[in-house]
From Swiss-Prot:
The complex is composed of two ATP-binding proteins (PotA), two transmembrane proteins (PotB and PotC) and a solute-binding protein (PotD). Residues 4-234 form the ABC transporter domain. It catalyses: ATP + H2O + polyamine-[polyamine-binding protein]Side 1 = ADP + phosphate + polyamineSide 2 + [polyamine-binding protein]Side 1. It comes from the Bacteria. It is a peripheral membrane protein. Belongs to the ABC transporter superfamily. Spermidine/putrescine importer (TC 3.A.1.11.1) family. This is Spermidine/putrescine import ATP-binding protein PotA. The gene is potA.
Length: 361
């Protein structure tokens, strides 16, 4: 049985439906992420899991028990927010111990539990410091330790890293992954950061307009998006309009608008003449001054329209026809492979027939 089950949950604010008939389940010990753009309903859903909002319809089951109308303090659930909400007049140790003191735990048990959490979040030497004496990342770890100290069944995290700088955010992602493995508690994590969702999660439910667009493992979502929204939301993606021209076995020919025919993998239920879009990740596109024309590859000549140097890679935008742009990602640091091109250079691009996904919605 799943630890958490969300069944047909709806939440309205006046005439606005923030969460629209969402159903999903989360397994015990899972790191589950809800990414989506602002206003997609992810935070409202998290607030219902915490008990800060009540659903207008549907059920929220935790260990098989309906929690939809249970008060927040009665749920075995804790929440970590973007703001750390630490008590400034208390030390790190006192902040972490606070929930246990309120629950009237024995002092020796409190001390042992706090010591264990300090070790889990790698802050053993900071127990006697005050919040203002610590970095943002350290304060966030204290907030997480406080939320975990009485071992809740479920930890909710509402964009906890968004206030940190990019480098510290990356470090904290690794800390969170290791911490979740160590404590074994189920995490449900809300973020607008696609990279964060891909890096942290066992599974991801991408949300848009109050609905779950697609739920799967990160690598499946990235490689096999269900629709244009998911393809475009999770990382860089070429989305090229086209029409199915012919079907042949496990492949099909698609006429890309403005630039010619390509082969791609067949999609169940697709018919000749059907319109759609080829979703193609830039790192799957080969780019060079000259490329061999191979039978299982799409091939185009073009001109470099723009280039964006990103350190380890460069993103090239290649115009292959009037107004038709294809992005190609090239590594910069591989000996014998790294090549650089300038705006206006004439180049050739190619990709394997199975490199992209044909989308019908």
């Amino acid at each position: 049985m799943a630890l958490l089950e969300i069944k047909n949950v709806v939440k309205r604010f006046g005439d606005y439906t923030a969460v629209n008939d969402v159903s999903l389940s989360v397994e015990a010990g899972e790191f589950f992420t809800l990414p989506g753009p602002s206003g997609c309903g992810k935070t409202t859903l998290l607030r219902m899991l915490a008990g800060f909002e009540q659903p207008d319809a549907g059920q929220i089951l935790l260990d098989g028990q309906d929690m939809s109308q249970v008060a927040p303090e009665k749920r075995p659930v804790h929440t970590v927010f973007q703001s750390y909400a630490l008590f400034p007049h208390m030390t790190v140790r006192e902040n972490i111990a606070f929930p246990l003191k309120m629950a009237k735990w024995d002092k020796r048990k409190i001390a042992a539990q706090v010591d264990e959490l300090l070790e889990d979040v790698r802050l053993t030497q900071f127990g006697d410091r005050y919040p203002h004496e610590m970095s943002g990342g350290q304060r966030q770890r204290v907030a997480i330790a406080r939320a975990l100290v009485d071992r809740p069944r479920l930890l909710l995290l509402d964009e906890p890293l968004s206030a940190l700088d990019a480098k510290l955010r990356e470090e904290m992602q690794i800390e969170l992954i290791n911490l979740q493995k160590e404590v074994g508690i189920t995490f449900v994590y809300v973020t607008h950061d696609q990279g964060e969702a891909l890096a942290l999660s066992h599974r991801i439910a991408v949300m848009s307009h109050g609905k779950v667009e697609q739920l799967d493992a990160p690598e499946k979502l990235y490689s096999y998006p269900k629709n244009r929204f998911v393809a475009d939301f999770l990382g860089q993606c070429n989305v090229l309009e086209g029409t199915v021209k012919a079907l042949h076995g496990d492949a099909m020919t698609v006429a890309l608008k403005g630039c010619g025919d390509v082969k791609c993998q067949a999609v169940a239920g697709v018919k000749e003449g059907q319109q759609g879009w080829l979703a193609l990740r830039p790192e799957k596109v080969k780019l060079d001054k000259e490329l061999p024309e191979l039978p299982d590859e799409a091939y185009f000549k073009g001109r470099v329209h723009d280039c964006l140097y990103l350190g380890d890679v460069t993103l090239y935008v290649v115009e292959v026809a009037d107004g038709v742009l294809v992005e190609a990602m090239q590594p910069n640091n591989i000996p014998g492979v790294a090549k650089f091109f300038d705006d206006g250079d004439v180049v050739e691009i190619a990709w394997r027939f199975d490199a992209g996904s044909f989308l019908t919605e």
